[in-house]
């Protein structure tokens, strides 16, 4: 995890729009890269690729029913790069009759594109889409995937459904949509595949202590307490745990740099 300084400063533009469903003002931060945007007043999911902002779906929810721990519009730095939180969704899986919900945050940088933060019961992961495919080995039990010389063991597979959304997304998000998610772990990292129809997306997450997320985004108060042990949470006895904490400590330095690219 790099602790180098941020990218050269830039002045991101913000586009103002109005919801065709209720007329409320909308703010578009990722421009042409946004595929859908959600009105937080009438809960219409809109086609951001259509100049008319065609309504794709409406869902019933209270805006404050599941408020993001990191508010939309918050800016921070991860791996030496500044990002803005532009989207938020709640997803749920059902395992042996029990529902488990977690939160995902869409982050955007106009030069670097998108990355994601996930949170479940106080456990956080910094996640990015893989640009090359891992090697899957289904001939062993449990199955494994290999990526950049590291082997990840299958943890679980379940159908994950989206139940709440806010902000903008680089895909056509829908409340009620579902896909099959498989997790393969090698703490502190996890590789996940999401299968929807014939499309498969692979991503890699790295476990991050909540306190480092709070420092990175200059959030008030304390992060939620961790409950239980997460699938890719590193053991405190492992040497690489210290390396993770030291790497993320560099974020604090980045935030104090006068050349912070978001102003």
Write out the residue ranges for each language-model feature.
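Mixed-charge, low-complexity intrinsically disordered regions
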Residues: 1-78, 88-91, 95-103, 112-263
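Extended, Lys/Arg-enriched charged tracts that mediate electrostatic binding to polyanionic substrates
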Residues: 81-82
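Short acidic-hydrophobic catalytic motif
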Residues: 85
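Short, acidic/hydrophobic/Gly-rich beta-strand patch recurrent on exposed beta strands
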Residues: 106-108
């Amino acid at each position: 995890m790099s602790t180098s300084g941020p990218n050269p400063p830039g002045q991101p533009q913000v586009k103002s729009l109005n919801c065709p469903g209720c007329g409320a003002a909308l703010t578009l931060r990722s421009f042409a890269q946004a595929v859908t945007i959600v009105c937080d007043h009438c809960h219409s999911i809109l086609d951001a690729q259509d100049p008319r902002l065609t309504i794709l779906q409406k869902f019933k929810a209270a805006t404050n029913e599941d408020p993001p721990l990191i508010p939309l519009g918050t800016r921070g730095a991860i791996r030496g790069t500044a990002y803005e939180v532009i989207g938020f969704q709640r997803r749920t899986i059902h395992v042996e009759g029990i529902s488990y919900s977690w939160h995902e945050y869409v982050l955007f940088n106009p030069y670097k594109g998108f990355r994601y933060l996930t949170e479940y019961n106080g456990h956080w992961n910094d996640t990015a889409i893989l640009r090359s495919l891992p090697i899957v080995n289904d001939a062993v039990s449990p199955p494994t995937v290999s990526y950049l010389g590291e082997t990840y063991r299958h943890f679980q597979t379940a159908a994950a459904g989206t139940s709440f959304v806010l902000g903008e997304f680089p895909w056509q998000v829908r409340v009620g949509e579902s896909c099959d998610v498989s997790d393969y772990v090698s703490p502190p990292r996890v590789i996940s595949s999401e299968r929807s129809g014939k499309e498969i997306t692979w991503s890699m997450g790295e476990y991050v202590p909540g306190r480092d997320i709070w420092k990175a985004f200059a959030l008030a108060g304390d992060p939620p307490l961790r409950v239980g042990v997460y699938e890719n949470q590193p053991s405190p006895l492992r040497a690489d745990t210290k390396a993770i904490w030291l790497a993320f400590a560099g974020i604090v330095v980045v935030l104090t740099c006068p050349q912070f690219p978001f102003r």
